[in-house]
Structure formats: C-alpha cells, structure tokens
Amino acid sequence: MNNREVIIQGEGILNLIPQRPPIVMVDSFFGIEENHSYSGLTVTADNIFCETRKLQEAGIIEHIAQSAAARIGFLYTRQGEKVPLGFIGSVDKLKIYDLPKIGMKLFTEITVVQEVFDITLISAQVKVEDKLIAE
C-alpha cells in the first residue's frame, strides 16, 4: 500500500478492537486491499510495554494481534454487525529484528494466508520508516 492515509484513528479504533486503555496497541487503521490490511502505532513513553525507552517484544506481538483484530473489526462494522471477540491460537516463526524507540511509528501489514470458518491464519510485517522490524 503506497497510500498511507489514515481512515480510522484515536477513539475510532475502539470500535474495531475489544481492548481498552491502557492495553490498546493500535492507534491508526489505513484500510484493506484484498487480503491485506494496514494499521499503525506510535510508540509513546506511557505505553505499558515500553522499557528502557523501547517497545518490548510483548508489545510488538500484541500490536500484531490487535492489527489482525482491527481488520476483522473493520469488516464487521462495515457490514453493520457486532465486532466479535477473538483470540490467538498460536504464534509461529516470529522474528523480531529491532525494538522501536519512543516516538517511532509502526506501520503493519497483515496478510490473510487462509480462512476456514471463523479461524484466520495471518502473516504480518511490522516496519518503521520502511525498515522491517518484525515478521
């Protein structure tokens, strides 16, 4: 996605995901193109997953999970339906290359690999300024 125009941000994100502050790990949603969705997070000093001025691994994992949830939430709200609760079945082959510092903006692409009934298998790429930090 070349166009990084935010379509939902701030309080509007709370309509897409079940989490509530202080655990909200998505602050912007850029939309969906086919089997890809795009979201973001600006790392702030008050983030509960920040230590030593960096977002820790658990925060990146939670950001990916909430990015996937935001995709589902967007699809359901667009159809006028209630957003379902979801959960992570497993995390496989996660690679974290760098921990983003306070003030950095994460841009995350969620790709749907497979959907069977209500189970969705995804892959994710998390970037900061086009540098891959996790997948």
Could you tell me what each predicted segment is?
Residues 23-26, 88-93, 107-109, 119, ...:
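Conserved beta-strand residues within beta-sheet cores
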Residues 20-56:
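Catalytic strand-loop segment that frames the active site of acyl-thioester-processing enzymes
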Residues 2-3, 70, 77, 101-104, ...:
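HotDog/MaoC-like acyl-thioester-processing domains
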Residues 10-20, 82:
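Short aromatic-glycine motifs in intrinsically disordered, low-complexity regions
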Residues 4-6, 70-107:
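Hydrophobic beta-strand-centered segment that forms part of the acyl-chain substrate-binding groove
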Residues 14, 27-30, 92, 97, ...:
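Conserved positions in beta-strands of structured domains
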Residues 52-71, 88:
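Compact, glycine-rich, soluble single-domain proteins
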